[in-house]
C-alpha cells in the first residue's frame, strides 16, 4: 500500500531528494504528474496554490513545501543517518537546503529560463542572475574546499537536495572552464550523483564542454506592416483677396456752404 501521493512534474529538481529518500526507506509513493495551471481538488488540498511538490498521505495528512516534505519522508526511518547525528547537524541540513532552495535555484532559473524562451528576456535581469549564481557558488566552493559533504563527513539529505538543484547549473552553464575554477563543487557534485540513492531517481545530465545556451531565442519573423498610403493632398487654394474698404465721403471745405 502506498504511503501517500506526491504531486510533481517530470525532472522537477525540488522533488528529486523526496523520491530518493522514499526509495531508500522503501516507502512507496504514488507519483502524480501535476498539470500546470490545472490542479485537481486533491492537489489543492495539499497546496492551495496548486504548486509542486505537494504531498497527501493515505491517512489524509497533507503537506506542501519541498523541504518539509523531504524531511517528513526521511524521518519515517527512525534509524536514518540522512538527518545527521546531532541537533547541530539537523540545523545545518536545514540551512543548506534553505540556501539552495531560496538563493541558488531562483537565480539559476532567472538565468536559464529567458535563454530557453520560457520567460521574457531582459539582459539586466539575466546579468544579475549570473552574478548572484557566481556569488552563491563561491560560498559553496569555499566551504567544500574543507569539507567532503555539506554536513559532517557523510552524505545527508542536504547533499541530495542541493545536488538536485545544482544539476540545473551543470546542465546549462557549468562547462569545463567553470568546473576547473570550482574543483570542490565539481568533486562534491560528482560524488553525490554517483551514489545509488541519487542516481536511481535523478535526471541524467551530461557534463558540458562549452556553454551553448548563451542567447535568447530569436523572435519569430513578423510580417511587415504595410506602409499607410498617404491620401492625395489637393493643392491649397489661395484665399481671394478681401475687397478694400470704401473710403468715406470727404467733408466739405470750411469756406464752402453745406449742401441744402
Regions found by a protein language model. Give the residues of each.
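GST-like domain detector, emphasizing the conserved glutathione-binding G-site
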Residues: 1-134, 141, 146-148, 154, ...
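Generic structural signal for individual residues within well-ordered alpha-helical segments
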Residues: 44, 91-94, 161, 186, ...
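Phosphate-coordinating loops and pocket residues in cytosolic domains that bind phosphorylated ligands
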Residues: 45, 162, 194, 203
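Active-site-flanking alpha-helical
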Residues: 74, 165-166, 202
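GST superfamily/GST-like fold recognition
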Residues: 103, 107-112, 150-192
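Proline-centered turn/helix-capping motifs that create local helix->coil transitions or kinks
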Residues: 104-105, 200-202
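Extended, well-ordered alpha-helical scaffold segments
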Residues: 128-132, 180-194, 198-201
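Intrinsically disordered, low-complexity mixed-charge segments
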Residues: 202-226
Amino acid at each position: 500500500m502506498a504511503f501517500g501521493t506526491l504531486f510533481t512534474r517530470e525532472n522537477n529538481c525540488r522533488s528529486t531528494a523526496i523520491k530518493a529518500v522514499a526509495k531508500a526507506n522503501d516507502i512507496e509513493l504514488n507519483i502524480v504528474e501535476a498539470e500546470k495551471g490545472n490542479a485537481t481538488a486533491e492537489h489543492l488540498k495539499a497546496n492551495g496554490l496548486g504548486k509542486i511538490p505537494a504531498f497527501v498521505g493515505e491517512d489524509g495528512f497533507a503537506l506542501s513545501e519541498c523541504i518539509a516534505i523531504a524531511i517528513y519522508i526521511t524521518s519515517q526511518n527512525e534509524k536514518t543517518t540522512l538527518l545527521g547525528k546531532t541537533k547541530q547537524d539537523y540545523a545545518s541540513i536545514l540551512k543548506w537546503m534553505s540556501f539552495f532552495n531560496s538563493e541558488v535555484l531562483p537565480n539559476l532559473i532567472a538565468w536559464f529560463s529567458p535563454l530557453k524562451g520560457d520567460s521574457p528576456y531582459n539582459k539586466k535581469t539575466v546579468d544579475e542572475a549570473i552574478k548572484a549564481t557566481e556569488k552563491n557558488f563561491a560560498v559553496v566552493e569555499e566551504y567544500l574546499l574543507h569539507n567532503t559533504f555539506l554536513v559532517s563527513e557523510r552524505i545527508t539529505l542536504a547533499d541530495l537536495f542541493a545536488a538536485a538543484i545544482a544539476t540545473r547549473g551543470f546542465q546549462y552553464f557549468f562547462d569545463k572552464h567553470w568546473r576547473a575554477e570550482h574543483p570542490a563543487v565539481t568533486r562534491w557534485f560528482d560524488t553525490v550523483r554517483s551514489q545509488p540513492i541519487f542516481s536511481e531517481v535523478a535526471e541524467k545530465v551530461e557534463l558540458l564542454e562549452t556553454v551553448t545556451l548563451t542567447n535568447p531565442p530569436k523572435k519569430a519573423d513578423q510580417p511587415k506592416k504595410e506602409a499607410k498610403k498617404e491620401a492625395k493632398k489637393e493643392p491649397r487654394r489661395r484665399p481671394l483677396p478681401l475687397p478694400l474698404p470704401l473710403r468715406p465721403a470727404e467733408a466739405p471745405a470750411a469756406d464752402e456752404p453745406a449742401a441744402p
